[in-house]
């Protein structure tokens, strides 16, 4: 351990700790202290080298490490040959190149201290073992040389060499790094944010060291009063659902998230109660917030004693879950906690579990609850004897009227509280008691007199009338509460869907809180789940389904309700028994969940389509610009090539090897590519000009064949003379046929001649058939996408625009272009065009605009 050493702790590199160590050593030398420099790294800094002047430096050892000659501190020279009073050792976390004696420099310092020599050393904050990961996150620079915290904390004195981040100007002036490395350092390690973070980290680490020393002093002196030297928050955990809100609430009590967080769970006197799942969850939450978990045995006062022993400044407790009667009584634990806390601030955190959960009033059963009926029965059995005792005490012949009315009040009161059955019991008992104790002859029950029968009938009639009114009022009240609860639930659900973010989880959580113990929303990966085919049926396994979201945990019983959520998911509720009205309400919630799923799907699609649309817009603009800019020089090249071909006999224009012909052909090919690019941009912009008129396919096909240079033996034409003209643009139709026939010729094997035929009905179909390799069914839509070649590596045949343009041209003319399999193998391109009607002459040469898109 570094007992007796003085360590200068710096935050960033170049903060001046080595310079400070050398400057502090000079006054000690002047006072007569024997000081030597055991090892100091100047890193080429002029200021550090100048500070070394006048101090004795122990010569270093020369060692060879992996073929490189290095110098290390001569520990034996310092201890044996020199033996000073104070040795200056730089870079405490340094790893020795030659590990014959020790691996780390701090181990060499321990040896020097054991020899009775005082040591002053330096280290940077990034080399402390517990902080290396944090520094790596801040600066992005990993650290391989470290020193254990316990070794450094054992030092006699640790001083932070602090400097404000604005001192980065020293770096810019060349005091830390040479000029050629300044810009790189300022843009990486020495950014203002990095310097601020490292500075705070160094101060906090030293504050922990000071706090540890303070704890030891308080323990030695027996001080148990609170010293608010550092914010320390103690939070009580119960393991119940209300405890989940305590740790986050406690973090708000720490200024800027600093200070110490201690979570305490108080167990019973025996201490054998096993920890619950909720307590484990809360413990993990506390540890994720940077706190520590503790468990004590005792009662509420033990919590206060722990807080006082930990020198806590604040205590966070929660509101207990209590019934209505308990809410009217003082809470002994909370009151005692307030009284015994002393200088510790006590915070009471509220939570959702304190007020109970939102539930829908059940419509099944009678209008009055069992609790109310039992309350009415209790009133009959308690107030009846009390009233009888009072009336018997003051019994007289003139009090019979008041006696009857008193019992009548009891019957009405019982009817208001408990309904008809307790009221009927109260009426019968009141009549019998009145006749037995208060009507002559006493202590006998005789109901043969009309008056007695009338009184008993009156009691029963009044009880039934009042009970009926109470029952109807209770029924209407229940319906009103149910309607209000449903309205509140639907309003909350609708608001969750409108807010969008987190709507699905909010809906599922709300559903669980209303009805059940667990609520999962399952989405099948293969096929939709229906109530008749739950997960696990028909060979499906859990792997066939993906849980979109869940809330709570499935109940232990087998009660499961499956509700379809549109065609995309199923809502699965565990531990629920629902009546018809609740199922109707659940269907509305399922519709809202379906809307939330659709909203999320649309949001994902929008995020995916947005960049694609922007890319397509830029590409279209680029194609248009390039096409227009390149067309003019290509036209000029074509003209020059044509002139050379025309004057090929001129000796001045002769070129060897048919150069004039090649010179004309290549610009022509490039001109076709530019024209295709321009047409693609027009089709994508929806501004392709189309002139639709009557066109005879037999007139267009020869021109297409001539353009390709195809002879009669290279293609089979199977045209029906009965097929009439079609409505199309002749130029565009020719380009479509040229593109389709060119592809058919290119992909047809040798000896297999492409076929062009046509058929008609309501429309005319032109079929271009080849016997090539064909295209997989799942990739046929891709052939109509611009710049798609589907594995064609022949870059001399074009840019992959032919079929895309053919699709756009055909749709622009009011037709369709589809793909079919060729019997025996291959691909058939089918061009479908409308037949020219009898009145088509009236609309001949009708201009039109393309609505096609790629």
UniProtKB/Swiss-Prot annotation:
According to the entry, every stretch annotated as the Histidine kinase domain falls at 625-837
User: Which SMART domains does the record associate with it?
Assistant: HATPase_c (SM00387)
- GO CC terms of this entry: plasma membrane
Provide the topology term for how it sits in the membrane: Multi-pass membrane protein
Entry's SUPFAM superfamilies?
Answer: ATPase domain of HSP90 chaperone/DNA topoisomerase II/histidine kinase
Q: What is this protein called in UniProt?
A: Sensor protein KdpD
**What are the disulfide bonds?**
none
Q: What does this protein do?
A: Member of the two-component regulatory system KdpD/KdpE involved in the regulation of the kdp operon. KdpD may function as a membrane-associated protein kinase that phosphorylates KdpE in response to environmental signals.
Catalytic reactions on record: ATP + protein L-histidine = ADP + protein N-phospho-L-histidine
- Which Gene Ontology MF annotations are present? ATP binding; phosphorelay sensor kinase activity
